[in-house]
């Protein structure tokens, strides 16, 4: 009896995940950012992060200009607007440092590592699985591009251990 329950539960979970992936694929396009979407990315950053953490307009646009391939966005097909984004900066360095947030000149196109800079989803789209899909797709894509590591930093207050 317990085995049947476990199998049914797992089957339902798998179907729900499959349905969620299908819904996300229908509603959202996951792709590289376009230059004309820079203003939307800046606005999203300002909505999703407090002022002292948000990337400035200047730095965001500089990153988009220099390393657009390291931006992955979720574009709502119904509205044509960005719902979420994930961005990083490739480098051969192994240690994350704060300068990656503000100096797009540290970008090394053939870098073996990606410093993960930002993951954000607009509040009205949160809870739909967009962030998970962005992370999964970003990791898959960068692995295909030969990256060895994705390196994340987080404020202590946001990652209780």
Give names to the regions the model predicted.
Residues 27-41:
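A short beta-loop-alpha structural element at the N-terminal edge
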């Amino acid at each position: 009896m317990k085995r049947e329950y476990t199998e049914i539960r797992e089957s339902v979970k798998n179907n729900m995940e499959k349905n969620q992936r299908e819904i996300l694929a229908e509603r959202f396009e996951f792709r590289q950012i376009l230059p004309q979407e820079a203003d939307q990315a800046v606005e999203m950053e300002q909505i999703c992060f407090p002022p002292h953490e948000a990337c400035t307009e200047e730095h965001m646009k500089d990153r988009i200009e220099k390393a657009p391939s390291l931006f992955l966005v979720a574009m709502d097909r119904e509205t044509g607007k960005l719902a979420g984004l994930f961005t990083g900066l490739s480098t051969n360095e192994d240690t994350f440092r704060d300068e990656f947030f503000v100096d797009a000149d540290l970008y090394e196109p053939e870098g073996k590592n990606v410093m993960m800079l930002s993951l954000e989803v607009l509040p009205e789209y949160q809870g739909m699985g967009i962030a998970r899909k962005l992370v999964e797709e970003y990791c898959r894509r960068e692995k295909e591009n030969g990256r060895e590591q994705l390196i994340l930093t987080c404020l202590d207050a946001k990652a209780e251990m």
